[in-house]
């Protein structure tokens, strides 16, 4: 049975770093699987490795995810063998959330993001 997934983004207007600096308009990409119970007591939060993505289980295509840098490893979720119907983390029983880390390259604010307001962090134009 195909794993049903839903990829979304959560927006944070201002995110304060430990250094005191503020990041503005932070986007956090995440994917959910299953259904949250009425009591909200069946949620499981799974974090990926530093080089992973929020694409935990199921199948994905570049056409459905045009905003992220694509590679073949993204076509099948990195924990597809463990998350899904009748698997170790059964999505008919649990509501699973996997978010991409801040600074990641797969849809969350990171090195691929355009930060117009942070021009003081960019290099000046160099004429030949």
Model feature map: region roles:
Residues 1-43, 55, 59-60:
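Catalytic-loop region of hydrolases
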Residues 15, 50, 123:
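Hydrophobic pocket-lining residues within nucleotide cofactor-binding pockets
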Residues 31, 41-112:
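N-terminal cap/lid subdomain of alpha/beta-hydrolase-fold enzymes
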Residues 115-118:
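A short alpha->loop->secondary-structure connector
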Residues 120, 125-128:
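Single conserved hydrophobic/aromatic residue that forms the stacking wall/gate
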């Amino acid at each position: 049975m195909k794993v049903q997934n839903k990829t979304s983004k959560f927006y944070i207007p201002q995110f304060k770093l430990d250094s005191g600096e503020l990041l503005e308009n932070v986007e956090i990409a995440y994917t959910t699987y299953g259904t949250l119970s009425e009591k909200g007591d069946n949620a499981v939060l799974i974090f990926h490795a530093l080089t992973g993505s929020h694409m935990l289980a199921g199948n994905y295509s570049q056409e459905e995810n045009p905003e992220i840098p694509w590679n073949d490893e993204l076509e099948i979720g990195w924990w597809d063998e463990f998350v899904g119907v009748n698997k170790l983390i059964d999505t008919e029983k649990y509501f699973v959330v996997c978010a991409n880390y801040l600074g990641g390259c797969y849809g969350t604010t990171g090195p691929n993001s355009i930060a117009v307001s942070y021009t003081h962090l960019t290099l000046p134009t160099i004429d030949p």
